[in-house]
């Protein structure tokens, strides 16, 4: 491994790129940990945003007008404000208020920056997931819905066994695009000092002034991740496509 690293550092040095930090455990280990943190953020937010998006969809399609209105308002606010601003509001305002309230009672705040990144990104993308699913439901043929109702299925059974599976398949392209955007949006974690790959890279280049070399690594890292998500999404679209829908 050391031989490969030395060879890589030497070869890239001829191109004017400084990757000597890879030979220093003090800098290499945090960088590798940052890669892991970024992946952990992405996996966590993908899972949480999918669950939250489904809950928002249920609220939108529910019979309670108040709940539906609140869900619609949340979606509109979330979709129309920047992710970074939402993260700052959550971490610098809401987190501060929680900290003050807990400290007044002699309790430490258990919510770390990682939690706020996952929460904000998950809720942000959940709004887009819910809209994609809503469009999927709107695209369902009326004959299918009428046929399910005529068979005597309950409303819940129709939703979980017929409508949702078909809507998911119709909404897959939009949902996959949301996941790709989520991978890229995870880069905002460094804004509140979460030790992801961006944050660790900043710590390194402030000492070594090798911004270009590290930026190329970051671009390659996120490029590979988005490619993998796109690849998986394309497979799912082919596997579960609805005949006649054209994708």
Predicted regions and their residues:
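Transmembrane alpha-helices and adjacent helix-loop boundaries
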Residues: 1-247
């Amino acid at each position: 491994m050391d031989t490969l690293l030395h060879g890589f550092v030497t070869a890239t040095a001829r191109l004017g790129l400084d990757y000597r930090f890879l030979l220093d455990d003090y800098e290499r280990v945090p960088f590798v940990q940052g890669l892991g943190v970024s992946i952990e953020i992405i996996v966590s937010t993908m899972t949480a945003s999918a669950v939250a998006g489904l809950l928002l969809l249920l609220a939108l399609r529910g019979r309670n007008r108040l709940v539906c209105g609140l869900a619609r308002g949340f979606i509109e606010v979330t979709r129309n404000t920047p992710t970074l601003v939402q993260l700052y509001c959550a971490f610098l305002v809401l987190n501060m208020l929680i900290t003050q309230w807990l400290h007044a009672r002699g309790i430490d705040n258990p919510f770390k920056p990682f939690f706020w990144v996952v929460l904000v990104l998950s809720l942000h993308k959940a709004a887009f997931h819910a809209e994609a699913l809503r469009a999927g439901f709107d695209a369902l043929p009326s004959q299918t819905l009428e046929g399910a109702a005529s068979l005597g299925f309950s409303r819940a059974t129709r939703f979980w066994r017929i409508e949702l599976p078909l809507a998911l398949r119709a909404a897959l392209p939009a949902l996959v695009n949301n996941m790709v955007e989520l991978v890229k949006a995870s880069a905002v974690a460094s804004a509140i000092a979460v030790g992801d790959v961006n944050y660790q890279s900043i710590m390194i280049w402030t000492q070594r002034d090798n911004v270009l070399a590290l930026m190329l690594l970051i671009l390659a890292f996120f490029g590979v991740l988005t490619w993998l998500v796109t690849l998986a999404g394309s497979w799912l679209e082919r596997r579960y496509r609805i005949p006649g829908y054209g994708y």
